[in-house]
Every structure is written in C-alpha cells, then in structure tokens.
C-alpha cells in the first residue's frame, strides 16, 4: 500500500531551513544543467480575466526519483470572503511507478525556494568582496531572500531594504523584516549584517554590490546607470 506524506504549512515551516533550501536549489540547478532534471511547459488558465486564474508548474528530478507539480490558484475576490487570495499545493510522485508520495502546502516551500534561488545566483555571480546588498521589495519573500543571501554570502555587512513603489513604507517594512530574518538564520549562525531601510532606492542601488528584487512591478524601476561599478 502506498504511503502518502501530507504536510501543512506549519509543519513545513518547522522542518525546512535556509541551508536545506540552498542545497536543494543548487542540486536542482546542477541536475538540470546535466540533463538529470527538467521543467515542463507551464499551464495557465484564467477563469475570470484579471480576477481569477491558476497556473500549473511541473517537472522531474532523476536524482530524487521524483516528478511533481505545483498548482497555484489566485482568486482576487477571496479576501472579501475572509479567504486567502492565493493557494499553492504541491504533489510529488515516484518517477519509477507513478505512485503519489507527498501532498504539500506550497506556500512556505515557495518562500524558501525563491529566497534560495536568488541567493544561489548571488553566491556564484557576485564579486568575492561584495559587502552591500539591496533588497528591492518588502513583501513576504523579502525575509527569505535576505536570509538566504546572508547565508550564502557571509561577507555581507550591510543590507538596504527598499519599497520601490512606496518609499515612505520602507522603514516600517524593514522593522518588520529584521526579526523574520533573525529567526530564519537563528539555526545557522545568526544574522551578521546591519539591515536598514534604504535612504532611497537610487542611493542604495549606487552603493550596493548585490541587488535582489521581488516585486509585482510591470515596468522597470532600476536603471542601468544606477548600478554600482567596481573601480577594479
């Protein structure tokens, strides 16, 4: 008889860590680059244009012996019904038999994965002497991106937090983000950088060695001329 593991959001939050997420993302990238993993075409459907939709993202990893999918549903009217606007659910299957293996709340997995993906990119692409990070975006993903970046780049000393669309909210958002970052890093050395609200997006961009973004922007908000260029 097939055993199906079912984990809700609280259980996943208690089990998953930043180091685990970083290792998983690195392994996924490595397997994809060598043909051992693949992403399949995304399915997108609008129930009501601009008001309700879903997307299905799927793929496989031979190294884990699994294939799976994540179904994300967005119903914009849900908050008025005291329901979340977003629902995310992941299903995993045995790649050899097709047997279902896990039913997971995809919310926290997405948070950790997104943070790890940004940080892994910075780990391999940033200069070794990078000391300053700009986090452009102050939503739910920001603490995970910052925490993962600090884990992957222990030389970082300063983190600027900016809300590109509402700069006046940056300070309050930063104050809320700091304890979340500290909690995420508590089990892996703690937070070693000063996290402060950006004086302005432009100023912080000019001073930063690494920039991570997580916003719903539909138009560019960072110009190339703002990016810091090392004198070396």
Predicted regions and their residues:
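N-terminal ligand-binding/catalytic initiation module
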Residues: 1-111, 117-119, 126-129
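Short acidic low-complexity segments
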Residues: 191-207, 224
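Conserved small/polar residues in nucleotide/adenosyl-binding loops
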Residues: 228-232
């Amino acid at each position: 008889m097939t055993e199906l593991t079912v984990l809700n959001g609280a259980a996943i939050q208690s089990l998953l860590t930043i180091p685990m997420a970083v290792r998983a993302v690195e392994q996924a990238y490595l397997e994809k680059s060598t043909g051992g993993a693949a992403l399949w075409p995304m399915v997108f459907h609008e129930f009501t244009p601009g008001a309700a939709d879903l997307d299905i993202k799927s793929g496989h990893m031979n190294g884990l012996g699994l294939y799976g999918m994540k179904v994300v549903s967005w119903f914009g009217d849900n908050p008025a019904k005291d329901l979340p606007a977003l629902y995310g659910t992941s299903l995993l299957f045995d790649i050899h038999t097709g047997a279902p293996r896990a039913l997971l709340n995809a919310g926290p997995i997405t948070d950790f994965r997104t943070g790890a993906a940004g940080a892994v990119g910075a780990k391999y692409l940033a200069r070794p002497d990078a000391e300053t990070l700009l986090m452009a975006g102050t939503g739910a993903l920001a603490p995970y991106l910052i925490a993962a970046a600090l884990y992957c780049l222990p030389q970082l000393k300063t983190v600027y937090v900016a809300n590109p669309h509402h700069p006046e909210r940056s300070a309050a958002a930063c104050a809320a983000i700091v304890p979340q970052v500290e909690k995420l890093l508590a089990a892996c050395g703690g937070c070693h950088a000063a996290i402060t609200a950006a004086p302005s997006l432009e100023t912080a961009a000019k001073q930063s060695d690494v920039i991570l973004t997580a916003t719903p922007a539909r138009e560019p908000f960072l110009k190339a001329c703002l990016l810091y260029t090392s004198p070396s």
